[in-house]
């Protein structure tokens, strides 16, 4: 598992709790939105290499909401994650479940689920690579993001830099994105979701990293599979944290889904993932970049 920002993070932000916000003003000079996205992707790729063989905590919380708006069921898990090196897959170990130490059976089940997901990702990656044309000299300017070329991803959106603001003393570009009516017809669930995604991103103007993202679906998206789901609404939020030395680390990712299952059961579920206690290792040296006062759960 890599300590990397979501691929769609290169496309959005704002309105997050605790953010120190200022009035949005027009950019001092014209900024090309697509060039800005490309620069962000290049910057994030360079930064990702700094997190090879890093460790961090990943806290996941899932909440099923009742029709009265109250939490009906809450489940939490804490993982200790070892990031992979380069393109290699990392690994993670289940540490806690609902605030108590995980049992051996729970650890085995989590490991089996991760292995199943890993194999699925490898198969999907292989299929995508088999369909992909050979790399050309322009790959640095049109890299692969996830399983698609950057140009294909941003070609699905109308992207605009709508202003600038200062957040925590740092300048940032405010970038809005919305589905492009002329986007290619979707071929997969991922394409259908992208073709319905709209939101705002805040891009740090110094390091060209994604400070935060807020996005939502503009229309329902049907997902087939083991249990078909009709997602009528989805809200997504992401925040990043500057660490210094041009490095940023994901802080939180939040997702809420509402809709119906194939059996017409009500769906209203939220997910929150928090990342903390990052440690970077270099040969015999260890760098602890946790925020002050956070003791962490990792040994």
Predicted features and spans:
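Structured extracytoplasmic
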Residues: 23-197, 206-211, 216-234, 240-251, ...
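Bacterial N-terminal signal peptides
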Residues: 8-18
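A residue-level detector for well-ordered beta-strand positions
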Residues: 201-202
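Bacterial N-terminal signal peptides that target proteins for export
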Residues: 1-9
């Amino acid at each position: 598992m890599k300590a990397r920002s979501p691929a769609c993070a290169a496309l959005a932000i704002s309105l997050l709790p605790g953010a120190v916000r200022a009035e949005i003003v027009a950019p001092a000079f014209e900024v090309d939105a697509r060039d800005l996205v490309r620069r962000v992707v290049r910057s994030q790729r360079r930064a990702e290499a700094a997190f090879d063989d890093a460790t961090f905590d990943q806290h996941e919380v899932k909440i099923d909401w009742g029709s009265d708006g109250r939490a009906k069921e809450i489940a939490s898990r804490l993982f200790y994650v070892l990031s992979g090196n380069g393109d290699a897959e990392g690994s993670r170990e289940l540490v806690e479940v609902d605030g108590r130490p995980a049992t051996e059976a729970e650890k085995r089940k989590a490991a089996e689920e991760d292995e199943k997901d890993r194999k699925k990702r490898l198969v999907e990656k292989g299929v995508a690579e088999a369909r992909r044309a050979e790399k050309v000299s322009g790959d640095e300017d049109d890299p692969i993001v996830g399983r698609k070329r950057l140009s294909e991803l941003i070609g699905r959106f109308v992207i605009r830099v709508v202003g600038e603001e200062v957040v925590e003393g740092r300048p940032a570009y405010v970038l809005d994105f919305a589905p492009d009516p002329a986007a290619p017809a979707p071929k997969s669930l991922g394409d259908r979701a992208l073709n319905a995604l709209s939101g705002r991103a805040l891009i740090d103007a110094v390091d060209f990293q994604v400070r935060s993202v807020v996005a939502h679906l503009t229309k329902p998206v049907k997902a087939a599979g083991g249990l078909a789901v009709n997602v009528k609404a989805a809200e997504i939020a992401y925040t990043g944290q500057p660490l210094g030395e041009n490095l940023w680390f994901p802080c939180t990712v939040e997702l809420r889904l509402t809709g119906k299952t194939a059996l017409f059961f009500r769906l209203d579920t939220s997910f929150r993932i928090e990342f903390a206690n990052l440690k970077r290792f270099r040969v015999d040296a260890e760098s602890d970049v946790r925020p002050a006062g956070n003791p962490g759960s990792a040994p």
